[in-house]
From Swiss-Prot:
Subunit: Monomer. Binds 30S ribosomal subunits, but not 50S ribosomal subunits or 70S ribosomes.
Superkingdom of the source species: Bacteria
Protein's name in the database: Ribosome-binding factor A
Encoding gene (name): rbfA
Protein's job: One of several proteins that assist in the late maturation steps of the functional core of the 30S ribosomal subunit. Associates with free 30S ribosomal subunits (but not with 30S subunits that are part of 70S ribosomes or polysomes). Required for efficient processing of 16S rRNA. May interact with the 5'-terminal helix region of 16S rRNA.
GO cellular component terms, A-Z: cytosol
């Protein structure tokens, strides 16, 4: 299977999961969750879904993680309705720390600029 297909499937899953989270999942724990990236396994059996949440509070992050785990079945079922694939991949949710890392770098650069 070519990388183009894997990338396209990952992009489609990202788009659909974002839409499902905002329109179909009513759990308040996942209301601020945004999907940032989806990485597919080579055989399309597993999709690692990276997410971010607006809140920096550890309790909100933990609630979002629990909410996503509880909603995985619903999300997968809705993906099955939307995608034309033989088998819908298993979803593994993982927090994306790249945005927090980028914000920290921005803050450090601003502090450096103030010192000069």
């Amino acid at each position: 299977m070519t990388n183009h297909r894997i990338d396209r499937v990952g992009m489609e899953i990202k788009r659909e999961v974002n839409e499902i989270l905002h329109k179909k999942v009513r759990d308040p724990r996942v209301q601020g969750v945004t999907i940032t990236e989806v990485q597919m396994l080579g055989d399309l059996s597993v999709a690692k879904v990276y997410y971010t949440i607006m809140s920096d509070l550890a309790s909100d992050n933990q609630k979002a993680e629990i909410g996503l785990k509880k909603a995985t079945g619903t999300i997968k079922r809705e993906l099955g309705k939307q995608l034309t694939m033989y088998k819908i991949p298993d979803l593994v949710f993982e927090k994306d720390n790249s945005i927090a890392y980028g914000n920290k770098i921005d803050q450090l650069l601003r502090e450096l600029e103030k010192k000069q």
